[in-house]
């Protein structure tokens, strides 16, 4: 006889059982948290109290791919690496970075639903925006078991647009995402990169010029990979086009601008670029004690990078967005330095979110924002019994 669902710490229902399970949990007012493949459930604030986990691991697969319309519909538990592999067969891709800690080739990238629920954009946001801007439709199961839909299967459909944006970055606190329709992009046939090294006081103006220029890099990232922790942060630039001549012109333009500023510019072939981008995204999800989400106004990025608290730490920060990650072992980053970094980010018009921290540290994942009353009001509308991911929003 099967053990009742509500007695299980982790529930992995079949797709046909999912809605009924959520209804049962609602009737019991039982706390629970949605999950994809569970690879990053320990990110962010811990869920308050005992809480079951409802996994979408079996809710997996591509429902429909329309290459001519550049759209794909997939179930929320679909591994991101499998979705990208299928799109690549049609020379398309979902223009998002692998989540931090995915490892080489994205094998530990987690699920599509988890990617959207976290809503954390990487360097590719510079050209393609974040994942929330690529969602054109979704289906979710609300806390009472009701199915809800927003958007559609065509890019021009804007019905339910606000709901889609709400779900991106909701950390599983508003509902369980069951399927998603996203906009795909043609895979660029040509891609090369540039690695720029030099003093921050020279790199800062160059980054500002590049952001305001007519060039359109895929990424312009401040970065310091784990292998170069003794060095200052540099710039990692990715360029993509339909032909090699255009890339040569763009690389030449940037290199010519860099030379008088005593900035060295190293051209990167596709494999070299992919390797360096991979280094800036962490090797695996459990490879460090601290994982910090940094955010500042873009014009404050160089001041943040010069902060002694960040000295020697691997990091990546979008030059155009001011958003990024830093990570470290507990011995390399004392708690008081994280608190100092948080104050710096706030003074620079941003914030610091602690996604993961050592067991010996008890810092709040994030601080209260002025918008908290509005966020809590939205939460009550979606989850009146406060069952979903308690403490995560």
Question: Where is each model-derived feature located?
Answer:
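N-terminal glycine-rich flavin-associated loop
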Residues: 10-34, 56-106, 120-153, 188-200
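Glycine-rich beta-strand-to-loop/alpha-helix junction loops that act as flexible
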Residues: 34-40
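Conserved glycine-rich FAD pyrophosphate-binding loop
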Residues: 46-49, 57, 102-107, 261-393
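Short, conserved charged micro-motifs
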Residues: 81-83, 201-206, 243-253, 300-307, ...
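C-terminal substrate-binding/cap subdomain adjacent to the FAD-binding core in PCMH-type
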Residues: 117, 136-285
């Amino acid at each position: 006889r099967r053990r009742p669902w509500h007695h299980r710490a982790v529930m992995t229902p079949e797709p046909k059982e999912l809605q009924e399970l959520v209804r049962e949990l609602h009737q019991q007012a039982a706390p629970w948290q949605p999950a994809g493949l569970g690879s990053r459930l320990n990110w962010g604030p811990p869920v308050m109290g005992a809480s079951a986990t409802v996994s979408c691991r079996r809710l997996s697969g591509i429902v429909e791919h329309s290459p001519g319309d550049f759209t794909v519909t997939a179930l929320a538990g679909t591994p991101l690496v499998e979705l990208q592999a299928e799109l690549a067969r049609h020379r398309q891709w979902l223009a998002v970075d692998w989540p931090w800690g995915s490892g080489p080739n994205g094998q530990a990238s987690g699920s599509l639903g988890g990617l959207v629920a976290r809503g954390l954009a990487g360097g590719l946001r510079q050209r393609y925006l974040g994942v929330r801007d690529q969602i054109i439709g979704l289906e979710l199961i609300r806390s009472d078991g009701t199915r809800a839909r927003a958007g559609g299967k065509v890019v021009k459909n804007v019905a339910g647009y606000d709901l889609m944006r709400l779900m991106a970055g909701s950390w599983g606190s508003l509902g369980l995402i069951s399927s998603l329709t996203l906009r795909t992009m043609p895979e660029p046939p040509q891609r090369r990169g540039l690695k720029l090294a030099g003093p921050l006081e020279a790199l800062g103006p160059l980054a500002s010029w590049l952001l305001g220029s007519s060039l359109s890099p895929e990424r312009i990232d401040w970065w310091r990979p784990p292998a170069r922790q003794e060095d200052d942060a540099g710039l990692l630039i990715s360029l993509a086009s339909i032909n090699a001549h255009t890339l040569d012109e763009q690389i030449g333009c940037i290199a010519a601008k860099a030379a008088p500023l005593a900035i060295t510019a190293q051209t990167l072939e596709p494999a070299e670029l992919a390797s360096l981008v991979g280094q800036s995204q962490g090797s695996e999800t459990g490879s460090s004690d601290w994982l910090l989400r940094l955010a500042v106004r873009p014009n404050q990025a160089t001041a943040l990078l010069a902060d002694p608290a960040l000295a020697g730490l691997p990091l990546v920060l979008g030059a155009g967005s001011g958003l990024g990650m830093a990570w470290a072992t507990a011995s390399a980053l004392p708690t008081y330095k994280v608190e100092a970094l948080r104050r710096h980010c706030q003074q620079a018009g941003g914030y610091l979110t602690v996604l993961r921290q050592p067991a010996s540290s008890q810092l709040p994942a994030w601080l209260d924002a002025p918008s908290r009353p509005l966020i809590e009001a939205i939460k009550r509308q979606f989850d009146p019994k406060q069952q979903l991911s308690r403490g995560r929003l």
